[in-house]
Structures are given as C-alpha cells and as structure tokens.
Amino acid sequence: MEAERRPGPVRRRRRSGLAGRFANRLVRAAVLVAIVPLVLTLIYCLPFVHPVSTLMLADLATLRGYERQWTPLEEAGRNVIHSVMMSEDGQFCSHRGIDLGELKAAINEALSGERTRGASTIPMQTVKNLYLWPGRSFLRKAIEAPLAIYLDAVMPKHRIMEIYLNIAEWGPGIYGVEAAAQHYFGRPSRDLSRREAALLAVTLPNPSERNPAQPSAALRRLASVVEARAQRAGGYVGCLGST
C-alpha cells in the first residue's frame, strides 16, 4: 500500500503566494474605497460643484430619473433653513460632526433594549446621502461617524447645510428643498411660509410616508413644535451667517 502523498513544499508555497496576493489586493481595494469619499469631500468644498446622492445615482441607473434644482443656501429661504436645522440638528453650529450627547443617549437606549432615538446630525446625514446606503445598521453608523467628523473639519458649515438641503430626499424622485417646495406647494423655497417650511422639515425623517401638502394630525402637531423652535432659532444659527 502506497504511502499517502503530502503536498510538497513547492505546492504549499504556491498556495501561500496566491493567498498573499489575494489578501494584498483586498487591502488595496479597501484602502481605495476609504480614500474615495475623503477626496470627493475636498472636491465638494468647491462652491461650483453640485454633488448628487447615492439615491439619485440609483434613480439614474434604473432609468427613473429625479427632480432636483440646485439652490444656493442664501436663496433657499430663512424659514426653510431654520426649520430644517431645528428639526434635524439643533446643535449643528456647536458640534463637530457628531452630537456626543445625543449619541450617548442613543447608545444607552440601545443597550437597555429601548427603542433608540435618532442621533444623526446633519453632517452624518450628509455623508450618508453622499456615500453610503439607506437603512439602519451599526456598520453604516460606524462608517458614518468618522466621515461626518472629517466633513465638518474640512468643509464650512454653510456649505454642509447647502449640500444637505440640495441632496435630501423629500419623496420618491424628489431631491433638494427647491424641488420639494415646487412639488408640494407650487412656489420657490424662499417664498414658503413658516408653516410650510416646518411641514417640509418634519417630512425629512420618513419622506416616503409623509406628505407635507396633505399632513396627518400628528405631522401637523410636530410641525407646530418645529415652527415655534424655528422662530427662536437666532442663537443657534450663527454659523450660517445672515441666512
């Protein structure tokens, strides 16, 4: 009976070499994927660049198309800017990409088994819209947080807000505050009343199920709260200049 043949040293070295090359390529690909958003963020700092979101790209890829009219921040309208900020991220001007207080509270709620609150800041939502995928997951949050800190470090606050307002989804195929204002209220965003601006703002967390033009009673109550906050937003919006 012949002795069982064992792989020789040459074969083992060949397998080891293939595994090493595969691992090397995998690392290079991971580094490339990590670098892309860092480079794009620097490009998006330029005021004449009009970024698109991953959802907008998906709409183009599936031939659905989308509505979006890029609007400079100073033309978006004070009512909309203040309402969105007070609804989505009241500490936008004071934090550095992530709101540690809200994040800590959300983590504590998750660990205790409670339903977690939203802890996403406007920078976090902006990098999610620009580079990541929708839906909730710890993996996405783990990527989102450092990207948001980087975004806030290299990009002026007013530019972050401008990009966010122009790529946020306000319904199927409707992106940006100007397209939303025209679609739901038939007028430019700068001409929206405080009430209309508040209704648009409270639609953002769930635009597929909330309609600012036909709000439910609960949505109207939430809009009333945001409208009141927006009227007192003076001390919170200093980083946005005279908007």
Curated annotation (Swiss-Prot):
* Keyword Transmembrane helix listed: yes
Q: Which reaction does it catalyse?
A: [GlcNAc-(1->4)-Mur2Ac(oyl-L-Ala-gamma-D-Glu-L-Lys-D-Ala-D-Ala)](n)-di-trans,octa-cis-undecaprenyl diphosphate + beta-D-GlcNAc-(1->4)-Mur2Ac(oyl-L-Ala-gamma-D-Glu-L-Lys-D-Ala-D-Ala)-di-trans,octa-cis-undecaprenyl diphosphate = [GlcNAc-(1->4)-Mur2Ac(oyl-L-Ala-gamma-D-Glu-L-Lys-D-Ala-D-Ala)](n+1)-di-trans,octa-cis-undecaprenyl diphosphate + di-trans,octa-cis-undecaprenyl diphosphate + H(+)
The Swiss-Prot or TrEMBL record describes its family as follows: Belongs to the glycosyltransferase 51 family.
| Family annotation (InterPro entries) | Glyco_trans_51 (IPR001264), Lysozyme-like_dom_sf (IPR023346), PBP_transglycosylase (IPR036950), Pep_trsgly (IPR011812)
Positions of transmembrane segments: 29-49
GO MF terms listed in the record are: pentosyltransferase activity; peptidoglycan glycosyltransferase activity
Q: Which keywords does the record carry?
A: Cell inner membrane, Cell membrane, Cell shape, Cell wall biogenesis/degradation, Glycosyltransferase, Membrane, Peptidoglycan synthesis, Transferase, Transmembrane, Transmembrane helix
Q: What is this protein called?
A: Biosynthetic peptidoglycan transglycosylase
Query: Mind telling me which Pfam families this protein's record contains?
Result: Transgly
Which cellular compartments is it found in? Cell inner membrane
Its Gene Ontology cellular component terms are: peptidoglycan-based cell wall; plasma membrane
UniProt xrefs under SUPFAM superfamilies: Lysozyme-like (SSF53955)
Function according to Swiss-Prot or TrEMBL: Peptidoglycan polymerase that catalyzes glycan chain elongation from lipid-linked precursors.
Q: What is the membrane topology noted in the UniProt record heading this document?
A: Single-pass membrane protein
Entry EC no(s): 2.4.99.28
The GO annotation for biological process reads: cell wall organization; peptidoglycan biosynthetic process; regulation of cell shape
Pathway given for this chain reads: Cell wall biogenesis; peptidoglycan biosynthesis
